[in-house]
């Protein structure tokens, strides 16, 4: 009896030899992880001693900048830079480092400046980052 059919069957079902998921086959776990990552950052932003600032208080210009698809990456970089000037923000900084994989690919190059965050101002940082995360949530399917 030949072992060839059994060997071929094993090759077909072996997980190590199956095709890896590609960009055209999105992983559900990646989407879930991005959603969890956004939620974790918001939870950290809402912890005392921070006041629970409402991002509805953002001016229209800041909202427009944070919502622009071609500014998603530059805005994230602005938050990554700003978090370094804040005290006790190591957990948020760590999560922001993981967030780039959750950004959709920009279709156009940024033609304007990203969001400005007041140096060392938790409330400004918190309000703008919450709004930014909300725009990412809206743009990405869950």
From Swiss-Prot:
Disulfide topology: 34-102
Instruction: Give the encoding gene's name.
Output: IL3
Could you tell me what this protein does? Granulocyte/macrophage colony-stimulating factors are cytokines that act in hematopoiesis by controlling the production, differentiation, and function of 2 related white cell populations of the blood, the granulocytes and the monocytes-macrophages.
Per the UniProt entry, the signal peptide is: 1-18
The alphabetized UniProt keywords are:
Cytokine, Disulfide bond, Glycoprotein, Growth factor, Secreted, Signal
Which spans are transmembrane here?
none
Q: Pfam family of this protein, just one?
A: IL3
Q: Where's it found, cell-wise?
A: Secreted
Q: What is the name attached to this protein's record? A: Interleukin-3
Quaternary organization: Monomer.
The family annotation for this protein states: Belongs to the IL-3 family.
GO terms in the biological process aspect are: cell surface receptor signaling pathway via STAT; embryonic hemopoiesis; immune response; interleukin-3-mediated signaling pathway; positive regulation of cell population proliferation
At which residues is glycosylation annotated? 33
Could you tell me one molecular function GO term of this UniProt entry? interleukin-3 receptor binding
Q: In which tissues is it expressed?
A: Activated T-cells, mast cells, natural killer cells.
What domain of life is recorded for the organism? Eukaryota
Q: Which PANTHER family match?
A: INTERLEUKIN-3
Q: Which organism is it from?
A: Callithrix jacchus (White-tufted-ear marmoset)
Q: Which is a Gene Ontology cellular component entry for this protein?
A: extracellular space
